Amino acid sequence: MIFSDIKRQVENIKKSDPAARNTLSIILLYPSIHAIFFYRIAHFLNNLHLYFLARLISQITRFFTGIEIHPGATIGKGFFIDHGMGVVIGETTIIKDDVKMYHGVTLGGRGNESGKRHPTVGSNVEIGAGAKVLGAIEIGDNVKIGANSVVLQDIPSNRIAVGIPAIIKEAK
């Protein structure tokens, strides 16, 4: 799973990042690849109830990449974080396949409630730099969320969300 996912990530990066030169440079130089690789290991350990070890790996990865992904989060295939510094992905977040996000994105909760408290993000979603998607909300497939938007409500599939708070518009 991990290595097939890296291959899919590399292909997604090549398609969407004009600065990507070749597979080797992507694997060695893109913090997103490193963060997601170690997230997969931490998530595996978390599922084995080795919570301390999972969180330790998560925190060490955050130190080296600037990307914080809780090992309890669920992330699909082909996930890409472009310029990942400052990304935070909460414990009960679910991210489906082929999602792209930029630096400074938070997929977080709104308080200290228990249970499902973070967003569920559909497939083929793009989340702009600095966006905050907060609470146990549903983001549909093929959604684009604008930079610095604050999303506090569900977004149906095939929409665009922009602003503070985000206004949902039809995709063109």
Language model features by range: what are they?
Residues 114:
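Catalytic-pocket segment enriched in acidic/His residues
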Residues 65, 70-71, 76-77, 82-91, ...:
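Left-handed beta-helix
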Residues 1-65:
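Terminal amphipathic alpha-helical/low-complexity segments used for targeting or macromolecular assembly
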